[in-house]
């Protein structure tokens, strides 16, 4: 009874989310190589002559005059290439400018975020709006159910061999089971660590962490403001944290950078969006351990916040670490290759599942009978409570199963 129930829900979960998991596998693999893709797409715009850089204030003024827009963010890369500047037009439209730091020329303009932003939005389906992002969140929740039920089914007949030929059902069953057994743990890790980016669950977690002070550094006493839409340049734990506000006045970006020298040589600078807002620097790093954010009072040049990874609480450190591993950055190239292998395994699971199901369907074994066992029901209820959007679709799936059973009994 339990095995039939687990198999039924493993199949139901797969039918719900296989296309989305395939999408996540392909776009996730591409995102792992976002740096290489960006350098290939923008090769002409990134190449600059090696020479001393102009003062940041001069660069900002030059880019503003050339684009007719206000520079809101400056990113200095670690490589000797063009700087990136985000500019905001009077109508609110934002674009990304590639700038030669040696003379201030704009080498190219593209949409805000560039190709990296496109890959990120494709991966999360945010490019389609809130509905698409919600579907990806649902898929990630169901992926957790798929992996756990799949492990249980495989454990009933543990085998890591592939027998027969592709013409037989056994080949595809063995291929699916062996792939899931070998790669399932990493797929489960990706599903869980990807949740903090989701639109509903992720924002809820982020708001909770921010509101309760669980993990993010405590902001200094005084007035606080938002990030003016630039929170994505910060570590996840600080993207909705209030920033300390200072007095009126502006010392300029060069003096602000001089005050924040400890942030390193590769950084993102967010310029004050409103009077009293600080200059906000975030180190461009790969490892979560190297995260560093510095806020400089625009009026006085005083450092009003200096937050490093060690200043985060255990909860925030765990989330930041998970995100860095998820992106294949925390442990260098081996980390990226493991994540790439997980994407390949997930894609193989997505392809083999419908083939396996179709080959058993003509024999009358398409959807196994049986309800939901008590233990499995409690597990799914817990998963549904933890991930509400997934829980709603679980209820819908349960309703469909009940209807099918009722129709089959007539």
Residue ranges, per PLM feature:
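Conserved histidines in hydrophobic membrane contexts and catalytic metal-binding motifs
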Residues: 1-410
């Amino acid at each position: 009874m339990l095995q039939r129930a687990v198999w039924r829900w493993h199949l139901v979960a797969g039918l719900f989310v296989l296309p989305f998991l395939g999408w996540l596998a392909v776009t996730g693999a591409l995102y792992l190589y976002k740096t290489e893709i960006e350098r290939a797409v923008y090769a002409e715009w990134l190449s600059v002559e090696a020479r001393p850089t102009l003062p940041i204030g001069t660069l900002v003024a030059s880019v503003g005059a050339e684009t007719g827009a206000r520079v809101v963010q400056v990113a200095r890369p670690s490589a000797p290439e063009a700087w990136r500047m985000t500019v905001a037009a009077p109508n609110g439209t934002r674009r990304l400018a590639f700038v030669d730091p040696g003379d201030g020329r704009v080498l190219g303009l593209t949409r805000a975020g560039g190709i990296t932003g496109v890959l990120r939005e494709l991966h999360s389906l945010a490019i389609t709006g809130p509905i698409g992002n919600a579907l990806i969140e649902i898929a990630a929740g169901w992926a957790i159910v798929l992996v756990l039920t799949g492990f249980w089914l495989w454990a009933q007949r543990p085998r890591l061999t592939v027998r027969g030929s592709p013409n037989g059902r056994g080949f595809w069953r063995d291929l699916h089971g062996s792939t899931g057994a070998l790669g399932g743990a990493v797929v489960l890790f990706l599903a869980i660590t990807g949740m903090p980016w989701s639109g509903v669950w992720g924002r809820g977690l982020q708001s909770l962490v921010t509101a309760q002070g669980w993990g993010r550094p405590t902001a200094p006493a005084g007035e606080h403001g938002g990030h003016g839409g630039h929170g994505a340049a910060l570590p996840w734990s600080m993207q909705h944290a209030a920033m300390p506000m200072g007095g009126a006045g502006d010392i300029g970006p060069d003096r602000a950078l001089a005050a924040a020298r400890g942030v390193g040589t590769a950084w993102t600078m967010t310029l004050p969006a409103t009077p009293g807002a600080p200059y906000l620097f975030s180190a461009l790093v790969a490892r979560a351990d190297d995260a560093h954010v510095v806020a400089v009072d625009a009026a006085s040049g005083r450092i009003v916040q200096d937050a490093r990874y060690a200043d985060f609480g255990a909860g925030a450190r765990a989330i930041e670490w998970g995100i860095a591993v998820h992106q294949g950055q925390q442990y260098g190239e081996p980390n990226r290759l493991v994540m790439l292998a997980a994407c390949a395994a997930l894609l193989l699971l997505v392809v083999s599942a419908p083939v396996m199901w179709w080959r058993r369907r003509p024999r009358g074994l398409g959807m196994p009978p049986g309800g939901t066992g008590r233990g499995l029901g409690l597990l799914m209820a817990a998963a549904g409570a933890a991930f509400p959007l997934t829980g709603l679709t679980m209820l819908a799936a349960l309703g469909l199963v009940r209807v099918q059973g009722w129709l089959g009994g007539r």
